[in-house]
Design a protein with these regions (language model features):
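Conserved SAM-binding motif I beta-strand of class I
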Residues: 138-143
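S-adenosyl-L-methionine
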Residues: 2-113, 145, 149-159
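Conserved SAM-binding loop of SAM-dependent methyltransferases across substrates and taxa
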Residues: 125-137
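Conserved class I S-adenosyl-L-methionine
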Residues: 114-124
């Protein structure tokens, strides 16, 4: 299941990257519904969409078939968060989020190999810890940037 999910995720990401014609600073794609190619628990997928819908980073969304897979494209802007994150002398890497599906698959792999706890240090908007929580991990998010902490609080309160 995981290999098929990863293979199909790579395919739609590559096709999307080659054919995207928008101008949003950041884009995210999520399958619209579970399928044979994307065998994701329905409630988990709904939670991933809820994360994107309630995340202030994303300003727009629309349905799009990518390689005949119905998906939702979320478009947004992280400039405010990226610029704020480089103000910290302790910042080694400015905020640039992992794709939600990538965070979910990474957490899924960790669960499959037997982990039950997840700690994400420098967690940005908290998506990795959020995915861990969906999969019943004892999940923790550590972030020092006050603006990103507020972003996480907003998302947590709304999801």
């Amino acid at each position: 299941m995981i290999k098929e999910l990863v293979d199909n995720l790579i395919k739609i990401k590559q096709d999307f990257a080659q054919n995207y014609t928008g101008n949003a600073h950041i884009q995210e794609i999520l399958p619209l519904k579970p399928s044979k190619e994307f065998p994701i628990d329905t409630q988990h997928l709904e939670q991933l969409h809820l994360f994107a819908q309630k995340n202030p980073i994303y300003l727009n969304s629309f349905e799009k078939n990518i390689l005949d897979f119905p998906c939702i494209v979320y478009e947004g802007d992280i400039n405010e968060y990226w610029l704020n994150s480089i103000k910290h002398g302790s910042s080694c890497q400015p905020f640039y989020p992992t794709w939600i599906m990538s965070a979910y698959v990474m957490s899924l792999v960790a669960k499959k190999i037997g982990y039950s706890e997840l700690v994400d240090i420098g967690s940005g908007d908290g998506r990795i810890a959020y995915c861990g929580k969906i999969l019943d991990f004892d999940s923790h998010s550590i972030e020092i940037d006050d603006v990103l902490v507020e972003l996480q609080n907003t998302i947590c309160n709304d999801t």
